[in-house]
């Protein structure tokens, strides 16, 4: 009969640091997790700092080794506990300091969360009976129960690469060509994790549109998030706040998943076809944050306060509303964002929103009418707010009401179109356009009853341009 494997005896960190070159087993609260690195032998290492009631400061540094990135500890929350077995205590810095090594051959670990200490990750060689350690975890939790704010403060400091030197920007503060650091939520990651979509609840500033006149006759090509992802994916996204795409090397996003909060360091913003594009630099880094990190909580407080406001679905950049540029027939309907419209659960509905008109197709006002008698008017306008772009038709009576004139006066119509799209009258060459914000009413409808969602379209109605 095989001899039953004995479970290792737990010791406290204060005692462990005295047992140099010996293997120990212990439980601690994770205070810090540093960015993983690849070793020369192609293994991976990440460094954790843990504490217990006997060694709350500065804590014990544990270097965890694994064959792959995915096998490294992936801390989910503040106050999560980690159980290490058979880690080796060792000295460094000429014997002045002590740390521990969690070998992938001999040592093992397990991570626990919640009041019931549910194990959510363990190394492949972890074979201990979890129940044997829950009493020790419960005792440790009770010791720190009244010190959670202190632990959070210590964790907030330890997540900094240089204490008191980090300054994070909101998306509403980005500028062309200026490097910045961002705290954001990952909403979606491509299958190969080469690109992610990020959000922080704020509105990126409207980007100037730079296009040659020869290009204006082409249909507008947008890089808006809704053109890159399916509607099913968009349904899980917030409908307020700008969502931007970030391209990163797959090794930087090796364990990023939707719902994660991260710090992105050393990003760079550019504008492509009127849309913001976030690019990485040679020094870009990704650091994970716990859901209850103070920075995350601050962002969500700001976002929740915005949603509670009647004007929360209006872009920050046109707040409170563009006065006197247009008038609408439905002044009682609440304002919505374009993402609200795109993800609305019904195919047909009426909406009121504040947008910019960033493109018109066809471009020449002489082509707005499709017949010689100039009775049938149709133009496709590309609308934009801080959340998305949306193409909406402006047709016939709705168009005549919108422009406030008949279609015979092409010169006046051209001036109104130029003002609406932010075109400078005197410019014949490449010039940036910055269209004004206008209030408008939009109707969603379908053209095929048998396939309503795939034939869903939009048109502007009940809106009059006053300029």
From Swiss-Prot:
Family matches, as Gene3D superfamilies: Nucleic acid-binding proteins
Source domain of life: Eukaryota
Keyword field: Chromosome, Cytoplasm, DNA-binding, Nucleus, RNA-binding, Telomere
Listed GO biological process terms: positive regulation of telomere maintenance; positive regulation of telomere maintenance via telomerase; telomere maintenance
SUPFAM superfamilies: Nucleic acid-binding proteins
Keyword DNA-binding part of the UniProt annotation: yes
InterPro entries named in the record: NA-bd_OB-fold, POT1, Telomer_end-bd_POT1/Cdc13
Signal peptide: none
Molecular function, one GO term: RNA binding
Protein task: Component of the telomerase ribonucleoprotein (RNP) complex that is essential for the positive regulation of telomere length. Binds RNA non-specifically. Binds specifically single-stranded telomeric DNA. Not required to recruit telomerase to telomeres, but stimulates TER1 RNP repeat addition processivity.
The name this protein goes by in its record: Protection of telomeres protein 1a
Originating organism: Arabidopsis thaliana (Mouse-ear cress)
Gene behind this protein: POT1A
């Amino acid at each position: 009969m095989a001899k039953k494997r004995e479970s290792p005896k737990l010791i406290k960190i204060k005692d462990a640091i005295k047992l140099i070159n010996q293997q120990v087993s212990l439980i601690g609260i994770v205070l810090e997790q540093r960015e993983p690195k690849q070793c020369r032998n192609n293994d991976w290492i990440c460094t954790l700092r843990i504490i217990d009631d006997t060694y709350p400061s500065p804590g014990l540094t544990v270097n965890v080794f694994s064959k792959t990135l995915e096998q490294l500890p992936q801390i989910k929350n503040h106050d999560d506990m980690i159980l290490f077995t058979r880690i080796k205590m060792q000295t460094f810095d000429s014997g002045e300091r002590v740390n521990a090594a969690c070998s992938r051959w001999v040592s093992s670990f397990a991570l626990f969360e919640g009041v019931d200490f549910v194990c959510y990750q363990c190394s492949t060689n972890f074979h201990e009976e979890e129940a044997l350690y829950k009493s020790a975890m419960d005792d440790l939790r009770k010791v720190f129960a009244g010190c959670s704010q202190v632990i959070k403060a210590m964790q907030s400091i330890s997540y900094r690469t240089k204490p008191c030197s980090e300054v994070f920007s909101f998306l509403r503060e980005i500028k062309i060509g200026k490097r910045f650091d961002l705290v954001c939520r990952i909403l979606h990651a491509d299958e190969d994790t080469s690109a992610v979509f990020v959000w922080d609840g704020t509105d990126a500033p409207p980007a100037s549109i730079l296009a040659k006149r020869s290009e204006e006759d082409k249909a507008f090509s947008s890089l808006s998030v809704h053109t890159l992802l399916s509607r099913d994916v968009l349904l899980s996204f917030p409908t307020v706040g700008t969502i931007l795409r970030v391209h990163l090397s797959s090794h930087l996003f090796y364990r990023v998943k939707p719902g994660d909060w991260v710090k992105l360091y050393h990003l760079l913003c550019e504008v492509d076809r009127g849309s913001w594009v976030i690019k990485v630099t040679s020094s870009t880094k990704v650091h994970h944050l716990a859901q209850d990190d103070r920075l995350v909580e601050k962002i969500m407080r700001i976002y929740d306060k915005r949603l509670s406001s009647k004007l929360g679905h209006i872009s920050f950049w046109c707040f409170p509303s563009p006065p006197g540029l247009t008038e609408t027939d439905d002044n009682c309907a609440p304002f919505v964002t374009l993402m609200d419209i795109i993800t609305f659960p019904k195919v047909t509905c009426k909406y009121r929103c504040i947008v910019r008109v960033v493109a018109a197709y066809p471009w020449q006002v002489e082509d707005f009418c499709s017949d010689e008698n100039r009775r049938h008017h149709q133009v496709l306008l590309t609308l934009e707010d801080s959340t998305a772009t949306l193409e909406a038709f402006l047709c016939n009576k709705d168009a005549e009401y919108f422009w406030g004139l008949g279609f015979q006066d092409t010169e006046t119509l051209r001036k109104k179109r130029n003002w609406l799209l932010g075109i400078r009258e005197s410019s014949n060459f490449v010039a940036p356009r910055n269209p004004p914000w206008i209030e408008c009413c939009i109707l969603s409808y379908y053209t095929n009853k048998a396939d309503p969602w795939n034939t869903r379209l939009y048109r502007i109605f009940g809106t009059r341009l006053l300029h």
